[in-house]
Amino acid sequence: MWRPITEAQPNCLAHARVAIVNTGFNESEPSSQSMSGKRGDYTASIRCISEQNIVFFVMSGPSADEALRYLDQLYARFP
């Protein structure tokens, strides 16, 4: 999943952190473009590429249905 953005990189990463935590994932150390988190066997990642005005949302885990449910929640919680 992706969506267009117009915000600066630090703001996008801050929103990514809030979305990951508010979806119930434990955050990990961010990189210059990504924020990730774990929740059991599931991993969430949000990648901000502000210079190209885009943010990507990725979810992985053992159940495709559950991963999609988490992905929808993550996407909805990103401002």
What residue ranges belong to the model's regions?
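Glutamate identity and glutamate-enriched acidic tracts
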Residues: 7, 27-29, 51, 66
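Terminal, regulation- and interaction-focused segments at domain boundaries
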Residues: 1-23
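C-terminal basic regulatory modules in eukaryotic proteins
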Residues: 50-79
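Flexible, solvent-exposed short loops/turns enriched in glycine
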Residues: 38-39, 49-51
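Short, surface-exposed beta-strand/loop micro-motifs that present aromatic residues
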Residues: 44-48
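A cross-family detector of function-defining hotspots
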Residues: 18, 23-43
